[in-house]
Amino acid sequence: MKMSIRIPPRLLELAGRSLLRDQALAVSTLEELPTELFPPLFMEAFSRRRCEALKLMVQAWPFRRLPLRPLIKMPCLEAFQAVLDGLDALLTQGVRPRRWKLQVLDLQDVCENFWMVWSEAMAHGCFLNAKRNKKPVQDCPRMRGRQPLTVFVELWLKNRTLDEYLTCLLLWVKQRRDLLHLCCKKLKILGMPFRNIRSILKMVNLDCIQEVEVNCKWILPILTQFTPYLGHLRNLQKLVLSHMDVSRYVSPEQKKEIVTQFTTQFLKLRCLQKLYMNSVSFLEGHLDQLLSCLKTSLKVLTITNCVLLESDLKHLSQCPSISQLKTLDLSGIRLTNYSLVPLQILLEKVAATLEYLDLDDCGIIDSQVNAILPALSRCFELNTFSFCGNPICMATLENLLSHTIILKNLCLELYPAPQESYGADGTLCWSRFAQIRAELMKKVRHLRHPKRILFCTDNCPDHGDRSFYDLEADQYCC
């Protein structure tokens, strides 16, 4: 019979747990508590909802940072409120505890090993290693040396109302705005009435926001309500706009005025590096207005599933802010009836820096491909190239592959199955497709040794609308 051996708790751990049961616990008592006991005891107090102990432990917290987000994933609003109550005492009293060091309450949803490190240290007695493994505190430069407490938070506005934790926090912040600084670096708006969004934005220091994602089915009149706030995001580095539509009740004159008001805000975004626009219908015929207001060199530009005019592509190729792009994604923009000379010029401009290129589902046909091949073959930094969903024949595909042969950094290539792979009714002929892949594999291996090439087929009955296959005849990649 096997016997399990249970390691007895360390004396320090037992002493700490007895403190949590002490109804007369005081800050003065905690000031004598070894630093290494604070994190594991705080976790236990939080999980057991020892509210009075939490209030006092916050007041005697011996670290600059309290990363609370991993703990509030447990349903314990009462414990969260106790932490805020403890902070209240710190913010309002004139004399603070001797060992109090707390400067940052961190509620960001990031990978956090603070609690794990200290828990393992408690179990093994390796407190020296725990101290070495602590992450440096992330400050907010704007408020350094001013308010005694900075609260870091990520705002995900995805429902009609806020979750109970965020509601509790924002109410607490609203009542103490002069005593602390609310810093939000990431803002996601995924669905909420704008009147609620407005009240939240008024509480946040907009200078702190570095990333914004708006993924709502907004029409232009709603966009006008967000526009004034955009201009105040002076440290914004990443902007994602998705599903912006033009209301049928908006006249062309009104549309032009609204787009002008919106795009001129980009003149103030002097830190912007990444711009993502998906299904943004008002760009059609107005892309030049936005591009002319960019004041920084973008690293990432994705304009996907939008309708653009040929003149929009021309303006894009002439924009000085795109010359240092590392990522260019134009997937879902129909280019079938357009000249690809602007795209050729664009690729020539970014050839020295471009690492990722996505031209999926652009409707590019055989007669258009030659226009971009010379420029594409000079993108020596390119590591990913996707060309799926474009109806090209075997000869064009072979020509395309021969031009990417000199791109030594290319790690992943995705191409459409040639049109010869399909029958007259548009369904995939598996035997023919297998033969084509075998022929391509032989030719490609003769030219070079690619790291990975995948071929995409449409309308696959077994694996959904789109399936990917390696060069090997029997290898399927979902």
UniProtKB/Swiss-Prot annotation:
GO terms for biological process: negative regulation of apoptotic process; negative regulation of cell differentiation; negative regulation of DNA-templated transcription; positive regulation of cell population proliferation; proteasome-mediated ubiquitin-dependent protein catabolic process. SUPFAM superfamilies: RNI-like. Gene3D superfamilies: Ribonuclease Inhibitor (3.80.10.10). PANTHER family: PRAME FAMILY MEMBER 11-RELATED (PTHR14224:SF19), SIMILAR TO PREFERENTIALLY EXPRESSED ANTIGEN IN MELANOMA-LIKE 3 (PTHR14224). The keyword Repeat applies. GO terms for molecular function: ubiquitin-like ligase-substrate adaptor activity. It comes from Homo sapiens. Belongs to the PRAME family. This is PRAME family member 11. GO terms for cellular component: Cul2-RING ubiquitin ligase complex; cytoplasm. LRR repeats lie at residues 99-126, 181-205, 206-232, 233-268, 269-294, 295-326, 327-347, 351-378, 379-403. Keywords: Leucine-rich repeat, Repeat.
